[in-house]
């Protein structure tokens, strides 16, 4: 049995989708972007007009289907240098951070994710004591933790809210995490769906960096994964990053190109169950990691073949596979056949390419 799967939030395998969407007609200095939960609404903030704009996507998270709703919301009454913004999980609250006042502002939307119903709550929270140039704001799932990225100190700061998504209950945790080793202008941050990965986009290197948190949403447990992805080929002034709900798509807004760019961040997997047969075949959807499961017991030899139809150039085999001369064979974009043998219960597999260019 062959079982295909996919995993999101894979920055190491990220690729540009050759899909972009211009926001120049709304703002010439776009600085942030957010989706609603369903991916059918996109929001872009711009510091030219200190305004957030609302767009509709007819296909969820597909930037190629985006169009402007002719709906916007000005925050100029509170902030003169809009940089980042985020919604609460239910879309009933909006939070804006800016480098003009070094402050986070809270708004209410009477209809979830509908900017036309937004109003200021007259609630704010200063982060100036931590950073004089805050550029982004995000929360954990229940709104009891808030995080600020600042370019004044090249760090991310953590705050607690005793009542979720209620900025009036916020306090600084005295917890911060420096990203200066990767980029000295951290303009955007996002978590994955469970808070074990943090992504930071930097405007100095035009790259996105990946970090792991051993305890979800706890910055004291963060460490750099030594994984990054350059977006310089699309734009040299990235200002914000966000991801789809499942992490298979990533989006970057650029202030020079005045556009949003779409990327794929999905890793494909293929699991081969050796208890179900000795002949397997699959067609990769992209870069794929192969797993071999349920080999026979030690002392029982088994041989099996794997047919790969299509481009096998980005196949990652298990480390337990030993190849001739210690190197996995060079793959081609044609149909290929691989053979494997194990006699020790799958501790070691001996593999070789048996044929290629099969028609």
Task: Describe the role of every protein-language-model region.
Residues 2-11, 56-65, 106-117, 160-169, ...:
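Short loop/turn segments immediately following beta-strands, especially the blade-tip
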Residues 17-24, 69-76, 121-128, 173-180, ...:
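A short beta-strand motif characteristic of beta-propeller blades
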Residues 37-38, 89-90, 141-142, 191-194, ...:
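Residue-level detector of Asp-centered blade-edge/turn motifs that repeat once per structural unit
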Residues 47, 99, 151, 203, ...:
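Short loop/turn segments immediately following the C-termini of beta-strands
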Residues 199, 239-266:
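Blade-level signature of beta-propeller repeat domains, shared across WD40, Kelch, NHL, RCC1
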Residues 267-318, 335-336, 341-359:
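Exposed extracellular interaction/assembly regions and N-terminal maturation sites
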């Amino acid at each position: 049995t062959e079982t295909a799967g996919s995993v999101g939030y894979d920055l190491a395998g990220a690729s540009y989708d050759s899909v972009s969407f211009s926001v120049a007609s709304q703002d010439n200095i776009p600085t942030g972007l957010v989706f609603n939960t369903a991916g059918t609404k996109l929001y872009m903030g711009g510091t030219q007009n200190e305004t957030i704009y609302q767009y509709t996507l007819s296909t969820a998270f597909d930037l190629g289907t985006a169009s402007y709703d002719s709906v916007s919301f000005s925050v100029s009454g509170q902030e003169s240098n809009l940089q980042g913004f985020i919604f609460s999980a239910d879309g009933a609250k909006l939070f804006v951070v800016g480098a003009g006042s070094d402050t986070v502002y809270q708004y209410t939307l009477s209809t979830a994710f509908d900017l036309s119903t937004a109003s200021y709550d007259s609630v704010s929270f200063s982060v100036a004591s931590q950073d004089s140039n805050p550029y982004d704001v995000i929360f954990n799932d229940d709104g009891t933790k808030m995080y600020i990225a600042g370019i004044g100190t090249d760090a991310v700061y953590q705050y607690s809210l005793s009542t979720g998504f209620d900025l009036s209950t916020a306090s600084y945790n005295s917890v911060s995490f420096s990203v200066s080793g990767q980029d000295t202008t951290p303009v955007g941050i996002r978590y994955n769906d469970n808070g074990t990965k943090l992504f930071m986009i930097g405007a100095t290197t035009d790259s996105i960096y990946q970090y792991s948190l051993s305890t979800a949403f706890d910055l004291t447990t963060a460490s750099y994964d030594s994984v990054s992805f350059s977006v310089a080929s699309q734009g040299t002034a990235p200002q914000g990053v966000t991801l789809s709900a499942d992490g298979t798509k990533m989006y970057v807004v650029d202030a020079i190109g005045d556009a949003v760019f779409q990327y794929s961040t999905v890793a494909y997997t293929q699991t081969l169950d050796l208890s179900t047969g000795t002949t397997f075949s699959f067609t990769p959807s992209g870069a794929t990691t192969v797993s071999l499961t349920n080999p026979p017991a030690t002392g029982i030899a088994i041989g099996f073949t794997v047919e790969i139809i299509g481009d096998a150039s980005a196949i990652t085999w298990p480390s337990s596979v030993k190849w001739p001369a210690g190197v996995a064979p060079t793959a081609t974009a044609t149909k290929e056949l691989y053979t494997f043998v194990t006699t020790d219960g799958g501790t070691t597999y001996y593999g070789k390419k048996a044929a290629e260019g099969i028609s």
